[in-house]
Amino acid sequence: MKLIRNIFVALAALLFSASLVNAGEKWDMALAYGAGNFHSANATEFAKNVTDKSGGKLTIVTHPGGSLFKGGEIFRAVRTGQVPIGERFMSALGKEDPLLEVDSQPFLATNYGAAMRLYQASKAEIVKGLDSKGLVFLYAVPWPAQGLYS
């Protein structure tokens, strides 16, 4: 049997500080992964959609590859207002809140359907936990199935 770890939410823990959007505002978005990674591609598409749908009132500029903050620094940087928005692999934030690691437990969700059910069951508490830290959860992206790792 192939060991599969299906991280349903790479959280693209897309987090952002709960600040108000001003007309014509530009936000820099910290991304840990390189521009070619699918999480960075999703974030770039998200940023484009925000710019388009806001009529240019908010422009989000993505900064892939840890060019603004390294992966392990993004959560703190958003919380402290050093950057208004950032994307982070959710289970990497387990020291902040153990619930953020729920999707990385081996064999808990072994396919995308099970991962979606786990996401739906845990989302409300994840959102509440991030809110208590002054962050807003925007979207989640499934992480492709992988084997166990340490």
Protein language model regions, located:
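Extracytoplasmic "Venus flytrap"
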Residues: D28-E45, G65-K70
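Bacterial N-terminal signal peptides that target proteins for export
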Residues: M1-V9
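Short, polar/charged alpha-helical segment
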Residues: G36-V61, A121
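Short helix-initiation/N-cap motifs at beta->coil->alpha
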Residues: H63-R76, W143
